[in-house]
Amino acid sequence: KTLLISPWGTAPRVTLDDTGAPRTWVYRTCFTDAFQGSALAKFAAAYMKATKAAVLYNPASEAPKSQAELLKKEFEGRGGQVVAFETYAAGDKDFSAQWKRIAEAAPDVVFLPSYYGEIPEQIRQARAAGVKAPFLGSDTWTNSELLKSAAEVDGAFFCAHYNPDAMEDKVGIFRGAYENRYDKEVPDDGAALTYDTLYLLKQALETATSDDREAVREAFSKISSFDGVTGRIVFKGGAPDPVKSVVIKQFKAGKISFVTNIDPD
């Protein structure tokens, strides 16, 4: 019996046991894959004004699969139409057949929840096949390595866990301390989430009736909200998964720019 708090584990099963019930000792401080799929659908419909979407994903990978399925469900629930729902297998190098079908479907937006190492080549093939629509990515796009493929990703939107350029005092203090420690490197999402996780644990340790494991877990379960560098983290009724905003960013002119926050409904 040990309290486990995942800063970065977005897969739905992280906090669930084999029966699908919440694990008593496991929490997370990031949003889930399902939640980001829903938020991206909301962004596509409400902000991009898209009415037709296409999806390309790897169904053998848990995170992209759950993101793709939830985006499809939410987008259709908002009155949109998913005109192509294409898949590929791990290790595939040729996506031309899928992109041809997607191009023929003429979507307004393409959701691509791929891992960053796959994305540039997939987009190159998409454009070669005649896909004109902008791309929308998951938090797998947050890796700054994608800036090396600026031409491919330019104009694409993706979701992230925090905005390092936010004006809140907590963000500035955290970023300044991190950059001083790590040679001016801007802290990424993983660093910000880990920072919030440690301060949440600190709060639980300070409010626990003792240093007993059960007492610390009980104290953590009673935290209802926490204002961190990744935004307000809300735990409803002791639930292991937080309710929090999703940050939308865009690759533009060789840089990553903040676009908006998608708040929970």
Regions found by a protein language model. Name each.
Residues 8-14, 28-37, 57-67, 85-95, ...:
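Hinge/beta->alpha junction and helix N-cap segments in small-molecule ligand-binding domains
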Residues 8, 44-48, 57, 71, ...:
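Sec/Tat-exported extracytoplasmic proteins
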Residues 11, 23, 123-195, 206-211, ...:
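Extracellular/periplasmic periplasmic-binding protein-like sensory domains
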Residues 18-87, 109, 201:
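An alpha-beta-alpha
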Residues 178-192, 202-258:
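Segments of small-molecule ligand-sensing domains
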Residues 1-4, 64-159:
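Extracellular/periplasmic bilobed ligand-binding domains
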Residues 1, 20-22, 47-49, 103-105, ...:
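Extracellular/periplasmic catalytic domains that process cell-envelope and extracellular macromolecules
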Residues 38, 42, 46, 65, ...:
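Solvent-exposed, polar/charged alpha-helical surfaces in well-ordered, non-transmembrane soluble domains
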